[in-house]
């Protein structure tokens, strides 16, 4: 499971997820990608489940890139504990995902295989996603320039 080796601080504020993703929203490594359409926290377990689903479907062919990393600790208090006495201990790690963020990229497989693999991974995600290709990305960039 993914988690940082060390962090500067053990606990973080929850924060807010406003707006769209300004970074990590373009295909950089592969030919096909899975893009988030809603804001959410994606846990390390969900990222790993998606990775396993894609690699199992694509078999030996293809290379997979995970474009998100769980770097935010989520704390929880023990069950049936009274209020007060500080913040709970870190339980798991999440990645803050905003709309437009690329979650996974894949190349070295056909579009049909990539689409099917990403669809299986999309079922593991807690949000709506879309399958995109480098060709589709270039078209959307050209539309913005006009």
From Swiss-Prot:
Keyword Ligase appears in the UniProt entry: no
GO biological process terms, semicolon-separated: mitochondrial translation
CDD domains, alphabetized: Ribosomal_L16_L10e (cd01433)
InterPro entries: Ribosomal_uL16, Ribosomal_uL16_bact-type, Ribosomal_uL16_CS, Ribosomal_uL16_dom, Ribosomal_uL16_sf
GO CC list: chloroplast; mitochondrial large ribosomal subunit
Family: Belongs to the universal ribosomal protein uL16 family.
Gene this protein is translated from: rpl16
Protein name listed in UniProt: Large ribosomal subunit protein uL16c
HAMAP family (UniProt xref): Ribosomal_uL16
Species the sequence originates in: Angiopteris evecta
Keywords: Chloroplast, Plastid, Ribonucleoprotein, Ribosomal protein
Record localization: Plastid, Chloroplast
């Amino acid at each position: 499971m993914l988690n940082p080796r060390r962090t500067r601080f053990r606990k973080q504020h929850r924060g807010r997820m406003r707006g769209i993703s300004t970074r990590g929203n373009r295909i950089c490594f592969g030919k096909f990608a899975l893009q988030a359409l809603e804001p959410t926290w994606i846990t390390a377990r969900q990222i790993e489940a998606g990775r396993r689903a894609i690699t199992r479907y694509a078999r030996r062919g293809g290379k997979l890139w995970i474009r998100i990393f769980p770097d935010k600790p989520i704390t929880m208090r023990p069950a049936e504990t009274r209020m007060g006495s500080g913040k709970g201990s870190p339980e798991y790690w999440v990645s803050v995902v905003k709309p437009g963020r690329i979650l996974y990229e894949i190349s070295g497989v056909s579009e049909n295989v990539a689409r099917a693999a990403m669809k299986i991974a999309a079922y593991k995600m807690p949000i709506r996603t879309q399958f995109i290709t480098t060709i589709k990305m270039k078209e959307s960039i050209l539309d913005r320039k006009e």
